Amino acid sequence: GGIICGYNSEEVVLNHVDVAYAGATPTESSASFQNKLFKTTIDGGVPAFHFCNVNGKFVMANSFFHDNYNDQTYFTGGNGVIINNIFADSGNAADGGEAINVKAGCKLDVANNIIYNACTNAFKLSNAGNSEVIPLSEMTVYNNTIINCGWRRSKNKKGGSVWVEKAAKPVFVNNLIYDSRFGLKQPKKDGADMEHSRLTPNYYFASTETGVAQMAKDAELGIWFDTDIKSSVAGQLN
């Protein structure tokens, strides 16, 4: 399993912790399953850290999350700061796995993290789950380094570095996306709230022609900004 917080969890601080090899499928005897937290059926893994209290607070700082079988983090509520962490080797080829997966109900400040080899995305930013009691998320994501993400997912429809959907409106600026499978992407329908988002400037580097092509202006589902800095040929701007 992982660190699965309850609906009444008020405050969590993860500082200088090492969380690894979490995310296995829960059993009927698992505390999270018995309390209907995150999973109500025995049908897949759980994140290494899950927080869900819209009115709660959490801090993740100076920590190392690695080799976790599913998402490293999954947030369906909470006011949080995620700073100075390393997220490495999340997910598995069949099911995928994000480093930071955000749904509705969150207010987050995310900065100065290194994300390496996420199976699918470093960031999946969404407003799924929004309701009368669960507000739209507010996310400020800056000064993060995203390396080599997306390549391990065997069925990759949802990006390879950053995926924005369901009217999410993040501030996502001054991040480095290095040798990841795709650039910033959104679905054809129900994508980002482009009017209220700020998604540029960011820096995108690719050392291969495949990487260049998959983050180019005409890349499928890609979000392009002329104000970004991007490799137009392999190895440019290293």
Give residue spans per PLM region.
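Extracellular beta-rich repeat passengers
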Residues: 1-238
